[in-house]
Amino acid sequence: MSVKRFVCAAVLAACCGMAVPARAADTIETGLIGAANAVEWPMYIGLHKGFFTDAGIKPDVIYVPTAPGLVQQLAAGSLDVCDIGVVEPIHAVARGASVGILRISGAVSPYAIIAKSDIKTIKDIKGHTFVIGGLVDINRVYLERVLKAAGLKDADIDITVAGSTSARFAALKSGSADVTMLAPPVNFFAEAAGFHSIGNMIDYTKDLPFGSTDVSRAFAEKHKDAVLRFVSALDKAYAWFNNDANRDGAIDILVDEMKNSKRDDVAKSYDFLRKIGFFPTDGTISKKHVEALMDEMTAIGDTNGKVPMDTLIIAGVSKVGP
C-alpha cells in the first residue's frame, strides 16, 4: 500500500471507529552478563516502565556468562547490542571487529573490595588469591590501580578468574579466593555472610569509566532508526532511576528481577549507586576518560596503544564530549 493510500485508509478507519494496526515493535537482541544484577538496573526499568514499548522496541534479553563471550557474540552478529565493561569494545575494535559504543552506561566503578576477615587493608592482600572477572577486562585494569596504591605487584598475589559478580562471590564463599571486587547488591550479601569491605574501587579509579552499551555496526547501519529509539528509551530509564521520587519503584523492579534478593540490600544498592553517580543520565562518551582508560590498558600490556575515538563511536548516534 502506498503512503497516500495508507493515510487515507487510516483516516477512514478512524472515522468509522476502526482500530489502525499498530506498527510491530523492532526486536533487538540484547546481551547482558551473568544474571540479573544492579548494574543493569536501567534496562529493567525500561522494560518494566514501558519505555522500550513506547519507543517501538522489544529487547530480547540474553545473559552470557563472561564479558569476552558477550563481545564475541556482538562482533559475530548473534547479538545486536550489549552492555559490558568499556575495555571490551576497545579490545574488539583493536582486533578489527565491527562494533561501536552507543553510550556510557556506568560512569564510575560500582565495586566494593570484599575480603576474608584476616585481610584488613589493601596492603594485606599480599600473598592471597584475588579473583577478578577476566585477565583482559575492566576488573584487571582496576586491580592494577589497587596494587599500585598498596605498593604491590602482580607477583605479590595469585590472580584467578570468575566471569561475573555472582561467580566471584561463589569463589569467595567456597574458599578458592580470599578477596575480590563485587558490585551491589552482591557486596551486601557478602558482608551478611561474614566477609567485609576493605575499600571502594571508586577511590582508586575515579577517572576511569566502567561500562558501555555497545552495538554491532552492521546492525546500527541497517537499523539506525531502531538504534536511536533504543538509546532514547534507555536515556529515559536512566533519568527515571536518577529521580529520587522513583526510589521505591526502582527498588521494586530490581527485587522482582533478582528474585531472591532482600529488599534492604537492594535499597542499599540504590542509595550507593545514586551517591557515586554511577548511572549517567545522558551517557556522553568522554574522550578524556576513555583515553585515560586506554592509557591504563596500554601500561599493563592489555593493548598496543590507543584506538582512534572515531573507530569506537557510532556517528550520528553516540554522544561524544571532551
Question: Would you name each region that the model predicts?
Answer:
Residues 24-154, 159-162, 166-171, 178-184, ...:
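Short, glycine-/small- and polar/acidic-enriched structural segments
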Residues 221-303:
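Secondary-structure end/capping motifs
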Residues 8-18:
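Bacterial N-terminal signal peptides
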Residues 1-3:
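N-terminal secretory signal peptides that target proteins for export/translocation
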Residues 291-322:
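Conserved C-terminal helix/tail region of periplasmic/extracytoplasmic solute-binding proteins
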Residues 87-88, 166-258:
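Pocket-lining segment of extracytoplasmic ligand-binding domains
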Residues 127, 192, 314:
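Phosphate-coordinating loops and pocket residues in cytosolic domains that bind phosphorylated ligands
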Residues 18-24:
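Sec/Tat signal peptide C-region and signal peptidase I cleavage site
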